[in-house]
Amino acid sequence: DDNWMNNSFASRERVKMDLFRRFGAIAAAGDRHLAEFCPGGWYLKDPETVKSWCFGLTTVAWRKEDLKKRLARSERLYTGEEAPVINQTGEEGVQQMRAILGLRDLVTNVNVPNLGQIPNLPLGAVVETNAHFSADSVRPVFAGPLPDSIYPLISRVSGIQELIVQAALDRDLEQAFRAFQMDPNMNLSMPDARKLFDEMIENTKKYLGMYFN
């Protein structure tokens, strides 16, 4: 039985319905993404809270095992031990490419710069809205302003994302820390937040050489 209790990627859509009841707007994303977007105490406080909302979390152990299987299969395909099977997977990216090539028209939700389709968010901020795909063209579809009831929740995250992008462009770790400590899921004290941030930077330092030159 492929349900939320034995599939980390499944849910009963309880978070979606709770947000709809509270804010009067239906969310497009699944419960796992919605939960991580909201303040941590709402749906991710502890394992018991997660379980009560009927969705699963992907464990580190699962990620490691999944990567191991993918690498092993890649090796079998490379050596010819396993023959590739060509079929339709349902991946929408294929349909998006077909539309851009002019083989069809498509309207779907994608991450694109805000060109005014959400008027009360900053222009240029990356937003997930519907867009019309056609030959050599991806045009955002007007979505309208965010309702007042959810504007503070989304505008805060949008502002933090702008901050972290600027930190990356400026190679400014202090700016990155400011964004980190303001994340809705950050509920540590300032000293503990700094300690965690510094540990994360230290453990990924080999990938961050440009920040230390």
Model-found features: residue ranges?
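Long, compositionally biased stretches enriched for glycine and/or charged residues
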Residues: 1-213
